[in-house]
Amino acid sequence: MRSRRAPTIVDAALTLGAHHAVAMPTRRGYVPAMGETSLMTAEELLRLNLPDKRTELIRGRLVVRDPGGARHGAVAMQLGYRIMAHAEAHDLGRVYAAETGFKLESDPDTVRAPDVAFIAKHRVPEVEPRGYAGWAPDLAVEVLAHDDHPAETLEKIAQWLKAGVRLVWVVDSEQRTARVYRADGSEALLGTNETLDGEDVLPGFRCPLADLW
């Protein structure tokens, strides 16, 4: 496992995002430029009806994407199942499925949806809202799709960490690797023969990357 200290990832990525005011067409969707349309709130996003689409909000800007591909879905499901089985067996907390929205910022609003999320038991509310979660998960898992842009992925990781996520896993099924990002700014690159470790966020959890492919 190759580790290095990366204390500036959050600031660098958020600075990139703050100056990214031009429209960004992608194969999956379209991010309108600032000023091209009025900013949307989390409440408006929740009421939006776009069947068979994946939506997020980035500082008030709507992102609309098509569903992920088969490999993306299979890897996300495989890892999510393993996380849920471990969390339930050890009464560690709650696991959330793909596309569960978490409101990370307000005025303008940011709503992100990871492929898998975990929240420690002591942080799970007695009554969960029907709308977006108003808190950040402890673990956020992102499974890269073939059209994910590196700069957009970096910005998303930075937003997770800034919001209080303690551990982020970014799984690349094409390269058969995973990157681990921690709240202290450190990160690690794992090869296909290495193992994801839940560390102190998901104690006792270990998943060989090779089992996901």
Identify what each model region corresponds to.
Residues 1:
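Catalytic toxin/effector domains delivered as secreted proteins or via bacterial secretion systems
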